[in-house]
């Protein structure tokens, strides 16, 4: 129950337990640092984490601008990421443990987002805090959380000495899962 409770705290930052379990426990820990499979390596076009990702001219400046974008991580959870991930994961029939019905998962996502907005935006305004102070506090909270989470994630998997192995033509990896974890972390 402790693990379930602690995992549920992701809702405080607008995350979703199902999405986190699939992205982190299934995709990331099964396919750690494998481009195209580990979603932690996919930051869209703006940041390039691996040599396999397409290179754009602006990537030569990413060491200067990426840290500012890291703070937007939990904003993305709140606004778009959870909806996109859930659609994608349900389409692929991915789950961690016993699979819940799509209707239950979508209902949970929508209700927790409504509760989230109610607690962090509506309630402070209702109790008399001016809207602009609420928005500043909301931004600072999210930016700080996003920055901390992103830096912790990147230090674990996207540093100079980690590797990004790719499967051979048959889709097989050259190392066992445990050895792969050591090389990629």
What is each model feature region?
Residues 11-12, 63-75, 100-152:
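Alpha-helical bilayer-embedded segments of polytopic membrane proteins, i.e.
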Residues 16, 78, 82, 90, ...:
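Transmembrane helix-loop junctions in multipass membrane proteins, especially transporters and channels
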